[in-house]
């Protein structure tokens, strides 16, 4: 939200297959101005905060898709992400009972010219392992992990959008897709 990628009013959805196994989060970056009411609802929004390098946010339309951000959950520890003009894989590798390492792989394409390569590298500094947004995601995962350690029976219900049990949602302000994925995962693990 801080940089206008995922804001109220963006066209967004969380899409899952019937089993919950496959899920995609998608959002279309809007060029519209965010309303003052929407700004009040965004905890991460900082009035007047700008990037010194505005090209971080340049989105070059590379193919016919309405989405500027897609995140595909392959398994609880593997996500394929396309954010703006970056393509990457995030893999969580358990490193002990209460520890993990986040591994990132960012991609370029053989047909990229030098300017597009620079652009992808630049955006990788926003979305990638040491990027402004990547660090925030890693911290969020740490909070979840720390929270789960305090749950006595090791079961936890994610409550964002509790009225929608599990599956597809037309908003990013929902965790119904992640609930569907974990229902599938628990079946696969025999839990």
Please give the residue ranges for each predicted region:
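C-terminal catalytic domain of Rieske-type non-heme iron oxygenases
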Residues: 1-191
